[in-house]
Amino acid sequence: MKVDLYTLQENDKNENNAIVVDHISKEFRIPHERKITIYKHIAGLIRGGSYSYEVFNALRDISFTVKHGETFGIIGPNGSGKSTLLKILAGVFYPDAGFVQVNGKIAPFLELGVGFQSDLTAKENIYLYGAIMGLTRSEITSKYDEILNFAELKRFENMRLKNFSSGMALRLAFSTAIQTDPDILLVDEVLSVGDESFQRKCSDKINEIRKAGKTIILVSHDLVTIQELCSRCLLIQNGHIVTCGETNMVVEQYLKLSTR
């Protein structure tokens, strides 16, 4: 499929933008043969030398900018590279080519495991994540009750995360991320968190953060939410940019691709 690549101009690469993504690519190696034990792995090397790998190109030559105060959407089919892209923005992965420039403090809400430890309690994780985000202990303490109340987890504050349901853990992660006062919030499928009431509360909070002039990068399959919140949008498929621009135009193109 022919793709319409968005090309950065030189004046895009300045601090007027919250994020600049310049020609990044990311690939993963997938082994053709799985070795279950170290012994089998070593035996295989002795018998046959090296193993063969399939190279999976998760992202290819991705470029775009996000302005300060903008709510920017990323859409595309499952497996298109959306979550990989957010992890690169968050610093979880590094691109194999290109570069990312971030102007501001990022708070990622991607998945449990980014900044949270399953063997620690909810309380310990709140303080750990806050410290990672650069908050002092007194700053975290001042936000502590609000974090637990928003997550609706006050009575579970001394429970270890490994005993939480996935929904409880994600509620805690989202509630903590939004209270660290980030300049840039990365959100992956927030509307999958919790029940319908909590999803609406998350959506309202994102809208509140947006109106406060913060930068938000939002990945979602909920196109209505993308259209409500995002001024611009990026559509990616099979690791490539299809188009980037005004949200309604990009969503319309995505719907056309989905019906082919």
Task: Please tell me what each predicted stretch does.
Residues I226-E228:
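A short, surface-exposed alpha-helical micro-motif characterized by mixed small hydrophobic
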